[in-house]
Regions:
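Conserved flavin/dinucleotide-binding core of flavoenzymes
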Residues: 121-207
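Central helical "cap/lid" subdomain
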Residues: 51-113, 122
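Helical element adjacent to the flavin cofactor pocket in flavoenzyme catalytic cores
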Residues: 11-61, 65-73
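N-terminal FAD cofactor-binding segment of flavoenzymes
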Residues: 1-10
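A short, acidic, amphipathic alpha-helical segment used as a generic capping/interface helix at domain edges
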Residues: 39, 113-114, 174-177
Length: 207
C-alpha cells in the first residue's frame, strides 16, 4: 500500500523515501538485543573523551565508526552537506504475566499515534516513538492489549533516547566519494550506519 508506506516514511523521517517495511515478503529478521552495545564491547579497551586530529592518521589501517559529519570536520572536507536526522525514543519493558515465545512487529503510520513501531521479542516488548513520550506506561499497556491481544502487567520499563535515530540520505555520489577518499588518503575504513551515513538494518550486518 503506497499510501501507508509513504505516511510511515513521512512520520519517521519527514521525507517520502524507501523504507524496509515496503517489503512484505516472509523473511527472517533481526532486532538488536537491549544490551547489544555492551555485548560487542566486551573484551575491548575503550577510551572515552579522546581527541582525534587529522595528523594522527599515520597510514595504519583504521576501522572507523565515527559519524560522517564529524569525520568530514576532522579531515577538513570542503563540500560538507546538511545531514538530516530525527531523534527517537525507545521504551523497553518485560511482559510479566505470560510466557511469550513469538516475535512480532506492528507499524503505526498514523500521525495521531505518538509511536511508530511496536515489537514483541518473546517476553521483551519495545515501543518506539518519534517524539518524547509522556505516558509510556499507558501506551505500552494499551498497545499490548488492543493490538497484540496481551492483557498483562509489565515490569522493568525504561525509555532510551537515540539522537540520530532516523537518518535521511545525502547525495549518494558525494557519500561514496568521501568514503573512498578516507580509504585512499588515510587508510580509514568506515563501518556502520553513521560512519557510512546509510540506513543499515541488522539483517544487513548478519548477512
Amino acid at each position: 500500500n503506497p499510501k501507508v508506506a509513504n505516511l510511515y516514511s513521512l512520520k519517521v523521517t519527514g521525507k517520502v523515501q524507501s523504507r524496509s517495511c515496503w517489503n512484505l515478503d516472509d523473511a527472517e529478521r533481526y532486532i538488536s538485543p537491549e544490551d547489544f552495545i555492551s555485548r560487542i564491547a566486551k573484551g575491548l579497551t575503550i577510551n572515552y573523551n579522546e581527541e582525534l586530529h587529522k595528523s594522527m592518521f599515520d597510514g595504519q589501517p583504521i576501522v572507523s565508526t565515527i559519524p560522517m559529519p564529524a569525520m568530514m570536520d576532522i579531515v577538513g572536507w570542503k563540500d560538507k552537506p546538511e545531514f538530516p536526522y530525527r531523534s527517537i525514543w525507545s521504551c523497553w519493558c518485560t511482559i510479566a504475566d505470560y510466557d511469550v515465545s513469538v516475535n512480532q512487529t506492528i507499524y503505526y503510520p498514523d500521525l495521531k499515534d505518538p509511536y511508530y513501531r511496536a515489537s514483541l521479542l518473546g517476553n521483551k516488548f519495545i515501543l518506539e516513538y518519534n517524539q518524547e513520550p509522556w505516558q509510556s506506561h499507558e501506551d505500552v499497556s494499551s498497545v499490548l492489549a488492543n493490538d497484540f491481544g496481551i492483557d498483562s502487567k509489565v515490569k522493568d520499563l525504561h525509555v532510551k533516547k537515540q539522537k540520530f535515530g532516523k537518518i535521511s540520505s545525502i547525495d549518494d555520489n558525494l557519500r561514496k566519494e568521501f568514503l573512498y577518499y578516507l580509504t585512499r588518503e588515510f587508510n580509514v575504513y568506515s563501518l556502520g550506519r553513521f560512519a557510512t551515513w546509510k540506513q543499515i538494518i541488522l539483517d544487513d550486518v548478519v548477512d
